[in-house]
């Protein structure tokens, strides 16, 4: 009897405990919301040995930065290229205004040291000028572009023009013409007066020396053409007694009542400082391209140089 009561009590206790555990037990889950997010690596598939199953293995890769890595330097900003400045256009100087001064106040250009082949050749073949009668040659223009006013035709043919106290000038310009190198040498005279009262204010005369090639060691004179009354004397080749080495000799002469002209001569003459067209100041070139000297004209300016070479061409 006592044993039955004891067993019943034990059984009652066990049932009560089991019921309490059953009541209090719940399914527990892992809260993933507090975990870091992971990036899954690509899936790796593995086959089982019997080929019945395929196992997939995913390896989580943390996106958290590696503290051992150094930060990439911030690149310097690329600046836009600076555009080249637009050059200021050269203003149009407008028409040339002639400034005239006394013929004996025009200062010549000093003869520059020749640099180019054409300059050296022009100096080498610079001619001698012999004044038979009439005026001596004078500078026509100065560095500022002022030009000589010339002289009236009165008094003796050489009155007032027997030479400038500043020195004289010969002007030059050269270039190829029909495969021959032409060097033009020009002189200015304040008046052309064969005798008192006749002639004209201002005079320009020139001679063209034609050579084979300025670049060879010993260029050869092929022809000489002195200017004469709007035309030319043409010597191809020149007479031997009119050449001194490589120097052409020309005379400024008037056969009355004709105006003055140049011609080849055997008489020795004088040299003048040579200034080539490209060596003149800009104002001097503008003046010689623009100033009206009356009946005579500037032989070597832009409008006359090529036409005069064509007219003086000495070869048939």
Curated annotation (Swiss-Prot):
<protein>
    <recommendedName>
        <fullName>NLP effector protein 8</fullName>
    </recommendedName>
</protein>
<comment type="similarity">
    <text>Belongs to the Necrosis inducing protein (NPP1) family.</text>
</comment>
<feature type="region of interest" description="Disordered">
    <location>
        <begin position="62"/>
        <end position="100"/>
    </location>
</feature>
<dbReference type="Pfam" id="PF05630">
    <property type="entry name" value="NPP1"/>
</dbReference>
<dbReference type="InterPro" id="IPR008701">
    <property type="entry name" value="NPP1"/>
</dbReference>
<feature type="short sequence motif" description="Conserved undecapeptide motif I">
    <location>
        <begin position="182"/>
        <end position="192"/>
    </location>
</feature>
<keyword id="KW-0964">Secreted</keyword>
<feature type="glycosylation site" description="N-linked (GlcNAc...) asparagine">
    <location>
        <position position="24"/>
    </location>
</feature>
<keyword id="KW-0732">Signal</keyword>
<keyword id="KW-0325">Glycoprotein</keyword>
<comment type="function">
    <text>Secreted effector that contributes moderately to virulence during infection by P.capsici. Does not cause visible reaction of C.annuum for several days after inoculation, but by 7 days after inoculation, small necrotic lesions become visible. Leads only to chlorotic areas, without necrosis at 7 days after non-host N.benthamiana leaves infection.</text>
</comment>
<feature type="signal peptide">
    <location>
        <begin position="1"/>
        <end position="19"/>
    </location>
</feature>
<feature type="short sequence motif" description="Hepta-peptide GHRHDWE motif II">
    <location>
        <begin position="199"/>
        <end position="205"/>
    </location>
</feature>
<keyword id="KW-0843">Virulence</keyword>
<feature type="compositionally biased region" description="Pro residues">
    <location>
        <begin position="74"/>
        <end position="94"/>
    </location>
</feature>
<dbReference type="GO" id="GO:0005576">
    <property type="term" value="C:extracellular region"/>
</dbReference>
